[in-house]
Amino acid sequence: MTKWKRANPNGTRDYLFEECTLIEEVEQKLRRTFLERGYEEIRTPTIEFYDVFAFQSRPIDEEKMYKFFDEKGRIIVLRPDMTIPLARVIGTQRCDTPLKVTYSGNVFRANESLTGKYNEIVQSGIEIIGIDNVRAEIECVISVIQSLQKLKVQSFTIEIGQVQLYKCIVKKLSIHEEEEKVLRTYIESKNYAALSNFIREKNFDRCDETVRLLEKLPRLFGNLEVIEEAEKLASSNEMKMAIARVKEIYEAIDKLGYGSYISIDLGMIQHLDYYTGVIFKGYIYEIGEEIVSGGRYDELIGNFGEMLPAVGLAVQVNQIVKALQEQQEPYERKRIDIMIHYELNRLAEAERLRNLLQKDGKKVEISLCSNLNDTFQFARKNQIVTVVEAKNESLVEYVWNEKWVVQKEGETSCVTFKLR
């Protein structure tokens, strides 16, 4: 029964010291950026009823949820997503809208073994509820670009897609559900040959504008030239409106000077039943992993109450940390400047001295060793060159110079000792 007591469950790991500090720093910098832009915080439980995620257009497969039972036999899950619980809160609490919210927390998904994906990850994100115009998408993109800039993430791009355009094409060509699922994989993977074969097998007229748009869809990625190409082939007002929305977002972001951080990919299709319009994906070139995902989901909150338009995105904190570790100089823990050793009856004076020295910008620690020699050994092992001893009615400062030598001594007050 103790076979696995020294191991971690599949897809999980321990985070130690510098890496743990970096994760916390990334979360806090994201939080500060979002709060500065007017987002308000929401926290939801780590566990939720399975029913919260059990709706037809859910983006997470049931097999990827960690499930167990509560004391009444009801199915509980570790949350596999942050947006859906947030939608539950908005739908059931009848919050006043429009509303801008931010969150951060761990999510859990049971990925297949050997995929290289972790089953527990940290997400920080934003959601804008109650706004159906393009300003909501623009705000999301600006917020995430500024947050990544403040984190000093290098070489990232935010791709902007539009699932509504693809839905219009599928509807106009009367492609059935099962065929559509196959078609979607061809477009997402940019499998041009398979897409061409699909069109041929369906006997679609290759001169038809909608068919031509479908065939070009995987190739429609880049800058505004992509929009111009798509506009020429858009055969309905709905298609034109979907394309125009992406164009508006791109142009607005570009005018702010953020054009180098964004691109368009009209062949990007994710969670088709979940998202209803513009979608986002962010990448860092060096790691090739998704660091941002999101989009417009106008039908989600209606599963829990009143139908409300919404758009949001999540930042994958673990991937950001991975990128920062590769892009920046190795993180060095700040070395301790001074170690204070004290006799038990001098603890108060040792603490006062520590506080005074820290105000001067020094990194100071109180020794946990029971005698001065052990403190000296600890200091040498950790490259600490100054030790202060608080004993009897005096303070003594030692410095390492081939051996421990007394630098100053005899002061009874930590204030005058520091000033000497």
Swiss-Prot record:
CDD domains: HisRS-like_core (cd00773). It comes from the Bacteria. Pfam families: tRNA-synt_His (PF13393). Pathway: Amino-acid biosynthesis; L-histidine biosynthesis; L-histidine from 5-phospho-alpha-D-ribose 1-diphosphate: step 1/9. GO terms for biological process: histidyl-tRNA aminoacylation; L-histidine biosynthetic process. GO terms for cellular component: cytoplasm. It is found in: Cytoplasm. Keywords: Amino-acid biosynthesis, Cytoplasm, Histidine biosynthesis. Disulfide bonds: none annotated. Signal peptide: none annotated. GO terms for molecular function: catalytic activity, acting on a protein; histidine-tRNA ligase activity; transferase activity. The keyword S-adenosyl-L-methionine does not apply. Heteromultimer composed of HisG and HisZ subunits. PANTHER family: ATP PHOSPHORIBOSYLTRANSFERASE REGULATORY SUBUNIT, HISTIDYL-TRNA SYNTHETASE. This function is generally fulfilled by the C-terminal part of HisG, which is missing in some bacteria such as this one. Belongs to the class-II aminoacyl-tRNA synthetase family. HisZ subfamily. Required for the first step of histidine biosynthesis. May allow the feedback regulation of ATP phosphoribosyltransferase activity by histidine. This is ATP phosphoribosyltransferase regulatory subunit. It comes from Bacillus cereus (strain ATCC 10987 / NRS 248).
